[in-house]
Amino acid sequence: MPKYYCDYCDTYLTHDSPSVRKTHCTGRKHKDNVKFYYQKWMEEQAQHLIDATTAAFKAGKIAQNPFSAGPPKPNVAIPPPSMGMPARPGMIPGMPAGAPPLLMGPGPMGMRPPMMMPMGMPPMGMGMRPPMMNGPPPQMNQKVYHNTDRRYHR
């Protein structure tokens, strides 16, 4: 009768029966060996990624650091409005340039101006959903019981 070999533990089990394999796989040593095996595998993958990135950097395929220069500088500096400058339409005189206009009347031919996002929210891109404010709907929080789970059936 063939014996069962455990690759993680590097040992043969006494019998090739489901009960022996189940007992072995639930043991502390086996679980520790499996955990160690996958930790070692992840470390090897990380080292491989580091080596590949280093080789690509040395070959000149990766830029130095695109984020070290900071944001691009604007070409034209707009002076802030002073008390003596006239206000733009919809602005209160002396209001800072970055503030949103307060009074927005109807646009050309009686059309409304476009809707503005609330302060502090970034503009949404195509296909993006608005953020959820109150969490998931109530039916998403309920636990689902399956017919095979006999603990919850009488």
UniProtKB/Swiss-Prot annotation:
* Keyword presence, Ribonucleoprotein: yes
Determine the domain of life of the protein's source: Eukaryota
Keywords carried by this UniProt record = Metal-binding, Nucleus, Ribonucleoprotein, RNA-binding, Zinc, Zinc-finger
Subunit relationships: U1 snRNP is composed of the 7 core Sm proteins B/B', D1, D2, D3, E, F and G that assemble in a heptameric protein ring on the Sm site of the small nuclear RNA to form the core snRNP, and at least 3 U1 snRNP-specific proteins U1-70K, U1-A and U1-C. U1-C interacts with U1 snRNA and the 5' splice-site region of the pre-mRNA.
Q: Name one Pfam family in it.
A: zf-U1
Q: Listed GO cellular component terms?
A: commitment complex; U1 snRNP; U2-type prespliceosome
Q: Which family does it belong to?
A: Belongs to the U1 small nuclear ribonucleoprotein C family.
Q: Which GO terms describe its biological process?
A: mRNA 5'-splice site recognition; spliceosomal snRNP assembly
This protein's name: U1 small nuclear ribonucleoprotein C
Taxonomic source organism: Aedes aegypti (Yellowfever mosquito)
What job does the chain carry out? Component of the spliceosomal U1 snRNP, which is essential for recognition of the pre-mRNA 5' splice-site and the subsequent assembly of the spliceosome. U1-C is directly involved in initial 5' splice-site recognition for both constitutive and regulated alternative splicing. The interaction with the 5' splice-site seems to precede base-pairing between the pre-mRNA and the U1 snRNA. Stimulates commitment or early (E) complex formation by stabilizing the base pairing of the 5' end of the U1 snRNA and the 5' splice-site region.
